[in-house]
Each structure stands twice: as C-alpha cells, then as structure tokens.
Amino acid sequence: MLTCIACSKQLAGGAPPLREQSDDADDAAVARGAGECATPSTRQAIKALTAQIKDMALKASGAYRHCKPCAGSSSSSPAAGARRHHPYHAYADSGSDRFHYAYRRAGSGGDATPSVSARTDFLAGDEEEEEEEEEEEGTTADGSEDDEAKEWVAQVEPGVLITFLSLPEGGNDLKRIRFSREIFNKWQAQRWWAENYEKVMELYNVQRFNQQTPLPTTPKSEDESLKEDIPATPPLNSERLPHTLHRSLTGGRTTGYGQPDSLGHQHNLGNGHRQQHHHCYTGHQCYGSVGLASTPKLSSISGAKTETSSMDASMRSSSSPEEVDRSRELSVSVSNASDQEREWVEEDEPGVYITIRALPGGIRELRRVRFSREKFSEMHARLWWEENRARIHDQYL
C-alpha cells in the first residue's frame, strides 16, 4: 500500500514511472509491483483513497474550522441557515467554541454580520431549545433578531442591580433598579440614586427620551404590611407628634398621640370631634380616650413603625396588685365613664415604642411593641425582644 501511495505521488508530480527507472534484473519484483500500480484504474482508486484520508485527517484535526476560505464560504452559502440547528453540526462544535459567542447588543449596526471567529451560530442541547423559544416569542414581523430589544442586568455596585433594554436604534433603556434590603433602606436607596443618576445614564448610554426618570421605589416585601411608605420616626422629646394619628378602638372610641411635657394641652380634632385634655407627666407619652363622630383613616400610621405582630400573644400579661398604684401616675380626663380602657405609648429606648393598656380594676396589659425600621431590622428586633422581655414586663406591668 505504501509503495502504491509513493507511486501515485511520483506520477502526479510528473516523474517517470517506476517501471522506467528499474532497469536492473535484480529489481524485478519491485518493477512488477510498480507495473501494477501504474495501471489507470488502480491509479484513480489510489488518488480517491488518498484524498479521502486527507479529508478525514483535516476534519479530525479541526483545520477546516480555522480555514479562512472555508469560513467565508460557509458564512455566505445559502445552506448556512439550514445548518444552523442541524444536530450533527451542533454536536461537532466543541464546548469551548460556544463561549466565543459574542453578545450582539442592539445599536451595533443591524446589517453588519460578525465573522465566524467572533461568534458561533451553533448551540447544543438545552441552549438550542432556549434560543428557538426566544426566537418564537421575541422575533419581529420579518423574523430578524437584530431589531429586538434585548434585556440585560448590570451590577453597578454590591446591592444595586439595574436592568437595561438594548434598543434597536442604539443605546439602552432603563427598565428596573433593584436594591438589596440588607445594604440599603428606602432613604439610602433614594439618596444613592439621586447621587449616581447622571453617572449611570452616561456610563451605560441610557437614552433619556426627554422624560424625567422617577426615583426608584423601595423593593417590595412579601408581607403586605411592609409595603406602606415608612416615614422617619421623629424624636419624641423635641417635636410634637401629629394629632391626626389615631387608632380605632372598640366601641367607636379612638386614641391619639398626646404632646410630651405638656400639662393641659387642648386641641381640636376636626369637625364632629370632641375636644380633649391631655395631662401627662414629664417624659411620658399618653393616650387619651375620646368619642368621635367619624372614624379617621388608619393609613396615616400604618407604616409609621414596623409592628411585630407575632409577639402580641407572648407579651400579654397582667400586673400584680402591688402595682395598681402606678396606674394613677397618668391623669387622663375621660369623656365617657370612668371605667373606660386607656392606652398610652412609652418609649423604652430610641426606636422602641411600647403600647400599654390600662384595663378596669387597675390591670395593665402590654398591647404591642413597635420598632423603628431605621434602627432595627426584623432579626435585630426579635433578638432585642428576647433579651428585654422580662425587663419590660417588670418595668411597665
């Protein structure tokens, strides 16, 4: 076989056949073998076999993949589209080639086609199915992908994720901004966006469209009670709490915040409301019961402080008879009968507000504990309550 291949190479190069070169009688056997190779039918078969072996060797070594004429012909041939999702070609491409896929963002020229070395059109397995689904869902009327608005996410800094849309005419559109609750609260997120708005718009080539970009909203929580806006908690020792904050009680009675460090402060709650005197000792925030003709809205205080409702059941207790005299420290004028229930709020420490109810007979009940969202996270609030539960019961009940 090797003699035949060498014979075919010499014949192809224009050299005289081995039959003419071997004139000696000692080389008779070699001459007979060369004479057999020199027949036209055998010569064509050898050439075809040699070409097939070379073709197989080149395909196995991957030389066709880096051949420029082959790459140009494969990208420009009409059969390239049919080979796009062919299972053989998808299997033939190695896994490393798939990572050379260049993400073509819109705005890079819809008519320009990247070279094969820059991107590959072959995907294998689940990636091919995902691409087909994206084509069916997001393709335009003419079926091209270059005009689609593609969505992508950038992490500007830890805890800040911005979702962009790549526009067909170039540039990006701002779709969504997300902040991590572990790093940002609402005010920190708004302040960050106000300071970095121009940088983000310039860095990511965001098209403004002559519109004012709104401030980002606070990331939503799964708990519906935490979706309300949360204003900053005002200091109780320097500012007067708004008298429009009320909470509805049973029997049509409501309670309102009293002014700290005041003796006999009188205010009007609006049309149909009765006037009420709040007599509070220094350092105490008091509630006074009052009859109202109309019930105020609860949304004004629904987000003032985070309320840990899971603690309510464990916090209810009654005081001992020795502590009955402590309830007389608060002198609250009641508009109805003298045996009505009373509620007031104590600030145990900055950001911790304890609501206490005085029941008929001098019994006190711990209604709830509220924590300021600016000072306590949910986990921090639970840990604080576990550590201070006994002290709160001893101190206030």
From Swiss-Prot:
Pfam families: BRX, BRX_N. Residues 124-148 have a biased composition (Acidic residues). Its main location: nucleus. Residues 150-205, 342-397 form the BRX domain. It is found in: Nucleus. Residues 220-230 have a biased composition (Basic and acidic residues). Residues 14-37, 105-148, 212-278, 300-342 are annotated as: Disordered. It comes from the Eukaryota. Keywords: Nucleus, Repeat. Residues 309-320 have a biased composition (Low complexity). GO terms for cellular component: nucleus. PANTHER family: PROTEIN BREVIS RADIX-LIKE 1, PROTEIN BREVIS RADIX-LIKE 3. Belongs to the BRX family. This is Protein Brevis radix-like 1. It comes from Oryza sativa subsp. japonica (Rice).
